[in-house]
């Protein structure tokens, strides 16, 4: 959403930009009165908020959720402990009767023997649930001050939006533990100072969070849950160095990934060790109380490498990763690239940085990515991993980020998500737009902040099913000549994806039709019917539909537990006989017959993207067509993902396709149109409404 869509007067908009830029420096901020400070803080905050949301509706929706989270809870009337008849009558005051009247304390304190166990009352959690993000900032010692300041500013804005943050500073690997410990402590102080320098922002650098046991010296644990959570409840951004203390009070540097895993385990309520003598119900109740106390909603990895790159297909990076479906494939892809980088005869990292990289750019698939997107390694860091070249270290970094995200999300609820991006991208989006001496903004706008955008929408900056050709205009700065591509990766534990038949075993072609039907035992037909009816909000004539697609089924895509899906068929244009001949098979049209997502899963979780990507990348990579009502509100989503569209004259249909260069093949185009015109719907209500 561009700033011009707010329809502000030019003077008001330039004033807002000027004030936002002025308020970003504490020096100018200190010269203002209290009321002026509050106004400037609010202006900058809401400007960033509106820039980071795709639509006004998303921003308003989040603000409504935020208000609901912090609304006062209704007071619950406590039940009377004793009935009126049983309660002791009050004695007249002014006369000390001692213990003569009424029961003595010894009676009240005497134990009561019961045959049954005394029920344990449920302990209500007095404090409201704390929503937080766990952040890992990799090698901050390599980052300029303005990047650290931009990261601090974004964390402060997240805090104001109701998302507390705990940041783990990662100094990287090295052979000198004492030097690493010093770097970690210095960088934690550096980030903490940057946060404290911001108006109305507070940090807490905790240096005694983790401990190491002699029985398990490789796995750190959290010393005190209360010491970790209390500062965040008070509005502080917690900064932690990956330093743990042993039983003999020695400070030891631990891998930052291990620190993140230990914090995740504690915040997820999974660090409690059950007592074998404790009632399992009591143990479950205790763990449940811990989990209701805190909600770890986001795991954010800020790494100079940025998001996870892609080396197969047209995309250059993974915008969204469904871990259940894609983790193994992406891991294997990165391992193959690393093996290629290790086996190729590459010069050293220093020679790459001196300008010799262009000669080998074509010989290694990661070279181009490294040359343009990795923060240069200073000479003093060159010997950190002397046995690895720059490309190998880059791939190793991506593998570590991918693995850490997978391990962390496996401990969290499915609603939690992860973000992998670069500190530079976060810092650039946190900077106010440049202004001219006259006070007018230059023809660029703020980049959408990937962290704030994700908090508002629970979606990636770009849809993963969006074609590469359409990403630049949406991702880049409107009005600029060049639109930088986003390397932010949004990660979800996600859901499994079922493709029937499996295209890796049997390709989806007209010659290899599976000759199956929807009442096949491998398909849960009642759940599939519920999915279709819930998505379309109409009753399906099941038998009529089964008859229509009989012997035409190309395959089925099911996301999760029938949360989304697609039914694809092979259709013949009217007048073409299905006689099994090569000529007949050549005329068959790949057709998307049903595309459905449960109402509760629409607009969130990326279910539609997961199904659509499977269809166009795995099942029908050479193209598929479908139709939709001309007034269907989903058409905007279809327009952005199709290669072309065609409004069918004298009908209420619009035809979409992903087949490259379809209009150049007149016969093929006419077959597509004939199929989209001729298919009859199979709805039980028979209202006459097409679709």
UniProtKB/Swiss-Prot annotation:
Keyword match Transport: no
Single GO MF descriptor: L-glutamate N-acetyltransferase activity
Composition-biased stretches (Basic and acidic residues): 75-87
Pathway per the UniProt entry: Amino-acid biosynthesis; L-arginine biosynthesis; N(2)-acetyl-L-ornithine from L-glutamate: step 1/4
Highest taxon in the source lineage: Eukaryota
Region (Disordered): 1-29, 65-95
Catalytic activity: L-glutamate + acetyl-CoA = N-acetyl-L-glutamate + CoA + H(+)
Protein family according to the UniProt entry: Belongs to the acetyltransferase family.
Protein name, entry field: Amino-acid acetyltransferase, mitochondrial
Organism expressing this protein natively: Aspergillus terreus (strain NIH 2624 / FGSC A1156)
């Amino acid at each position: 959403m561009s700033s011009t869509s707010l329809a502000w007067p030019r003077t008001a908009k330039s004033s807002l930009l000027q004030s936002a830029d002025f308020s970003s420096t504490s020096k100018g901020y200190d010269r203002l009165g209290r009321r002026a400070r509050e106004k400037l803080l609010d202006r900058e905050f809401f400007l960033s908020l509106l820039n980071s949301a795709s639509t006004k509706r998303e921003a308003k929706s989040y603000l409504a959720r935020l208000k609901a989270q912090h609304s006062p809870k209704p007071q619950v009337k406590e039940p009377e402990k004793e009935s009126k008849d049983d309660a002791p009558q009050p004695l007249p005051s002014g006369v000390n009767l001692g213990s003569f009247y009424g029961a003595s304390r010894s009676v009240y304190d005497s134990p009561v023997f019961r045959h049954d166990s005394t029920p344990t009352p449920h302990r209500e959690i007095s404090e409201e649930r704390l929503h937080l993000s766990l952040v890992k900032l990799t090698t901050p010692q390599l980052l300029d001050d303005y990047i650290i300041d931009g990261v601090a500013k974004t964390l402060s804005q997240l805090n104001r939006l109701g998302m507390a943050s705990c940041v783990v500073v990662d100094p990287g690997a090295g052979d000198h533990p004492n030097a690493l410990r010093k770097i970690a402590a210095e960088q934690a102080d550096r980030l903490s100072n940057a946060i404290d320098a911001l108006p109305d922002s507070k940090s807490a650098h905790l240096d005694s969070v983790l401990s190491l046991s002699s029985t398990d010296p490789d796995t750190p644990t959290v010393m005190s849950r209360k010491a970790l959570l209390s500062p965040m409840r008070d509005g502080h951004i917690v900064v932690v160095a990956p330093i743990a203390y042993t039983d003999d009070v020695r400070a030891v540097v631990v891998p930052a990934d291990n620190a993140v895993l230990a914090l995740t385990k504690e915040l997820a309520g999974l660090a409690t060790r059950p007592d074998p003598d404790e009632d399992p119900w009591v143990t479950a109740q205790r763990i449940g109380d811990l989990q209701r106390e805190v909600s770890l909603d986001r795991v954010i990895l800020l790494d100079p490498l940025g998001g996870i790159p892609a080396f197969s297909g047209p995309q250059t990076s993974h915008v969204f990763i469904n871990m259940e479906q894609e983790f193994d494939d992406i891991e294997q892809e990165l391992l193959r690239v690393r093996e290629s980088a290790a086996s190729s005869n590459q010069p050293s990292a220093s020679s790459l940085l001196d300008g010799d990289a262009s000669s080998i750019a074509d010989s290694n698939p990661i070279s181009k990515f490294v040359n343009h997107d990795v923060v240069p390694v200073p000479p003093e860091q060159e010997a950190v991993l002397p046995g690895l070249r720059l490309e190998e270290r880059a791939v190793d970094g991506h593998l570590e980020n991918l693995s850490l995200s997978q391990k962390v999300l496996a401990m969290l609820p499915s609603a939690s998500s992860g973000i992998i991006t670069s500190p530079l991208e976060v810092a650039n989006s946190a900077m106010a737009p440049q202004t001219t001496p006259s006070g007018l903004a230059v023809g660029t706008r703020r980049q959408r902040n990937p962290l704030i955008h994700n908090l508002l929408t629970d979606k990636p900056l770009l849809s993963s099913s969006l074609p590469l050709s359409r990403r630049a205009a949406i991702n880049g700065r409107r009005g600029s000549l060049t639109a930088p591509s986003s390397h932010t990766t949004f990660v979800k534990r996600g859901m499994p994806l079922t493709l029937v038949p499996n295209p890796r075993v049997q390709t989806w072609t007209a010659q290899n039709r599976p000759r199956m039907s929807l009442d096949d035992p491998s398909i849960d037909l009642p759940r599939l019917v519920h999915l279709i009816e819930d998505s379309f909000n109409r009753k399906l004539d099941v038998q009529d539909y089964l008859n229509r697609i009989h012997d035409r089924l190309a395959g089925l895509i099911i996301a999760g537990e029938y949360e989304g899906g697609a039914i694809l068929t092979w259709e013949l244009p009217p007048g073409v006989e299905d006689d099994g001949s090569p000529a007949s098979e050549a005329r068959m049209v790949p057709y998307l017959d049903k595309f459905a997502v449960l109402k509760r899963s629409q607009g969130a979780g990326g279910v539609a993207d997961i199904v659509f990507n499977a269809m166009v990348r795995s099942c029908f990579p050479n193209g598929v067509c479908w139709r939709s009502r001309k007034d269907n509100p989903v058409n905007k989503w279809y327009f952005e993902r199709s290669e072309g569209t065609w409004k069918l004259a004298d009908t209420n249909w619009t035809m979409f396709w992903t087949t490259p260069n379809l209009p150049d093949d007149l016969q093929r185009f006419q077959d597509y149109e004939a199929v989209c015109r001729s298919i009859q719907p199979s709805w039980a209500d028979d209202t006459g409404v097409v679709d």
